[in-house]
């Protein structure tokens, strides 16, 4: 494998990178024992290459998924622009061959989304904790709705990014002299 190799009879290995083109999904678990279980666990989840996605907050108490992560009709061979895997994969596959040109646009959108999620987290969780003290199910619903909203927001921004990349970097862009 590319992670293990031999040179002059000596064996070497590389650690597996966290961001590779064959990644189907990845997540970062954020676990806080000082919060109630329903609030303390978040999976920062994303479909496709870890460097080319915006991780969205999925609270561990969620009981429903955003449609973009459970899209009827979408599968490994059926594209859907309502499906996060397909849209994120579409964008990544546009970026790979022209990484130095396209990645800065992707990074700007990715960082904008993630920074907004991180900035909102204290307020969102303060509200959830307040709800939790009087109505546990209301707190769970609030976080579930928040996760779905942020998942849908990510998908919408990624679709916009895909269209932007196609228009800005199409093979005619240099000839027209216009930047879209």
Task: Show the residue positions of the predicted features.
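C-terminus-biased signal that marks the final domain/tail of proteins
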Residues: 1-180
């Amino acid at each position: 494998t590319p992670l293990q190799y031999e040179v002059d009879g000596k064996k070497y290995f590389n650690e597996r990178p966290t961001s590779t083109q064959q990644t189907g999904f990845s997540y970062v678990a954020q676990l806080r024992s000082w919060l109630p279980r329903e609030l303390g666990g978040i999976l920062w989840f994303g479909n496709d290459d870890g460097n080319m996605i915006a991780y969205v907050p999925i609270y561990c108490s969620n009981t429903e998924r955003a449609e973009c992560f459970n899209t009827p009709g979408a599968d490994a061979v059926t594209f859907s622009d309502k499906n996060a895997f397909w849209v994120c994969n579409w964008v990544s596959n546009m970026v790979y061959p022209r990484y130095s040109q396209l990645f800065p646009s992707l990074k700007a959108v990715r960082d904008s989304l993630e920074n907004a999620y991180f900035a909102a987290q204290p307020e969102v969780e303060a509200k959830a904790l307040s709800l939790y003290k009087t109505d546990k199910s209301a707190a769970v619903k609030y976080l579930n709705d928040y996760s779905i909203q942020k998942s849908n927001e990510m998908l919408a921004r990624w679709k916009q990014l895909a269209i932007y990349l196609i228009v800005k970097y199409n093979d005619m862009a240099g000839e027209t002299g216009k930047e879209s």
